[in-house]
């Protein structure tokens, strides 16, 4: 999931929407996940219906809220410098695949629907480059900017305070996320870094 300070949601006009992904109220407002009435009704029915089913859905919603809070704290903790000497950080990733960085939300029949693929946008606005707005180079799971702990693809842009992740070395391959560890170049670079007596 993206850093809480990064834009992750756009409308069909291509404009950034300022909603907090880690705030349970965002999920409630858009009717996503266990806040989608169809999902909630199905979950309640599968768990006894009535008061028992409603209690189960309430528990799922609290579970989601708890994990969103934990996710926010985890991501924010990465920006806090560790006391003392930190080991050098080396990151590996792919950057040859267009990777989802932002989703488009559109209102369909009174519901807010999140779109992760350009072809799923029901009412695209002419002139909006959805591919450029939604996708960035990555490995189909993690964008290059995210792996580097950056808010932008522009590596010459000065780092903001939220970009405190200090990386000693980065290696990018033309590989999908799920195949990275099987890539011979990945293995070679990792072994070199782990076994080298020289600092990274």
Report the location of each language-model feature:
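Helical cap/lid subdomain of alpha/beta-hydrolase-fold lipid enzymes
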Residues: 1-200
């Amino acid at each position: 999931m993206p850093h809480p300070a990064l834009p992750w949601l756009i409308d069909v006009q291509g404009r950034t929407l300022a909603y907090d992904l880690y705030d349970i109220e965002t999920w409630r407002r858009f009717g996503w996940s266990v806040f989608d009435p169809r999902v909630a009704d199905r979950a309640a029915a599968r768990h006894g219906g009535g008061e028992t089913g409603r209690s189960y859905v309430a528990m799922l919603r609290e579970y989601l809220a708890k994990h969103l809070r934990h996710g926010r704290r985890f991501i924010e903790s990465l920006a806090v410098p560790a006391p003392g000497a930190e080991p050098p950080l080396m990151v590996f990733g792919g950057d040859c695949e267009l990777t989802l960085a932002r989703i488009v939300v559109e209102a369909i029949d009174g519901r807010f629907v999140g779109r992760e693929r350009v072809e799923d946008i029901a009412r695209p606005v002419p002139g909006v480059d959805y591919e450029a707005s939604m996708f960035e180079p990555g490995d189909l799971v993690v964008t290059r900017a995210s792996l580097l702990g950056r808010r932008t693809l522009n590596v010459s842009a000065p780092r903001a305070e939220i970009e405190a992740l200090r990386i000693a070395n980065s290696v990018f391959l033309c590989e999908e996320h799920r195949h990275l560890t099987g890539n011979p170049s990945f293995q070679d670079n990792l072994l070199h870094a782990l076994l080298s007596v020289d600092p990274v």
